[in-house]
């Protein structure tokens, strides 16, 4: 185990000098080998570049405050290793797999490197089974595949985390399997809320949690998604169906941008790292299902300035099976979840996978909403009276559909006061089919707002008259 010393420290970037014949390899973990009152004990550094003459450039996984030149560093000779297996369930860990929940050491019989190869093409096993979420708009227009990858896209404050929490609530509780949650560069409060949500629902013993919050240095935030993924991969390789939640994948990209700039690489479009596509691909290619087990991944993706063409969300799009796009315009109407049914897509929305009825109802809903969108300018200028009878009917139905796409969430009960609703897929299809076919043209549109099934809308209409 070779020993070196710190020769330069610029923020999170630390240069370490070793004897020339004992230079660490790229991605080797180095540990600060001396006690100092000013610096975190056992600070881990990950080698990013070999500069030559025995000097390597590393990124600190913790705060580098108090580091000084000449401090001793030892090479562990291996990459960052984290505990995996059943000992991680019900525990909260940091990027290095250390417990941060004050519940004692993690009893794991195996450790794995966070840098693993993606499964080969022969090992992959695509799935066409649907994963019911109980959220009407998602199940109807952008259904999830079991073992697929889903992205929740949205700008600031349109409800990505609330939607993610509801999906965890509906799927993790219904699905008796195991889940891994990676909190990448998000608020500490949200991690705390998630922990208590899981504890109150008695599913904590089926969830492993890894957090690298927004107050952590960029090296930490860049690697925490890999730590969570390594834990999920171990469960998959045991032959299990795993849920892997990431909040937020954009912060992973942002941490990569910070690290890239610190390492002196030339930035590319909009200041992102030149290796953006490669870094994203390396992470996403590992989140996949094999013939042994599956990983179903749900990832929140922050969209900077609501611009879906920004390089970060645009690069993420390529890897996903379903994209759930949250719209500020829909949120402004008070319709939650604020999912845009015209912008959201799914590869599963195919008559051969979801069935002819589901497919035709979803397309009828989208075409009705599209017609309303086209007529909105005419209505704004000339008013409803100038429309033809067919268009008036289309607008009335579209407004009912729009309101029926809203739904009270279990996780939002605290601040809405309305009990949450889980709507089975068959009830969702039945309700929207009836609205599109004009069976509820006589009901007021307010009856369809914030209800679960269509029967609830009918009951609500009775109270409005």
UniProtKB/Swiss-Prot annotation:
Cysteine pairs bridged by disulfides in the record: none
Catalytic activity as recorded in UniProt = ATP + H2O + 4 H(+)(in) = ADP + phosphate + 5 H(+)(out)
Annotated GO molecular function terms are:
ATP binding; ATP hydrolysis activity; proton-transporting ATP synthase activity, rotational mechanism
Its membrane topology:
Peripheral membrane protein
Domain of life, source organism: Bacteria
Q: Where does this polypeptide localize? A: Cell inner membrane
An annotated GO cellular component of this protein is:
proton-transporting ATP synthase complex
One Pfam match, by short name?
ATP-synt_ab
State if Methyltransferase is listed as a keyword: no
Is Cell inner membrane included in the keywords of this UniProt record? yes
Primary residence: membrane
What EC numbers are recorded for this enzyme? 7.1.2.2
Report the enzyme's class at the first EC level: translocase
The residues the record assigns to binding ATP are 154-161
Q: How does it assemble?
A: F-type ATPases have 2 components, CF(1) - the catalytic core - and CF(0) - the membrane proton channel. CF(1) has five subunits: alpha(3), beta(3), gamma(1), delta(1), epsilon(1). CF(0) has three main subunits: a(1), b(2) and c(9-12). The alpha and beta chains form an alternating ring which encloses part of the gamma chain. CF(1) is attached to CF(0) by a central stalk formed by the gamma and epsilon chains, while a peripheral stalk is formed by the delta and b chains.
Q: In UniProt terms, what function does this protein have?
A: Produces ATP from ADP in the presence of a proton gradient across the membrane. The catalytic sites are hosted primarily by the beta subunits.
Family the UniProt entry places it in: Belongs to the ATPase alpha/beta chains family.
Protein's UniProt name: ATP synthase subunit beta
Task: Name the gene for this chain.
Answer: atpD
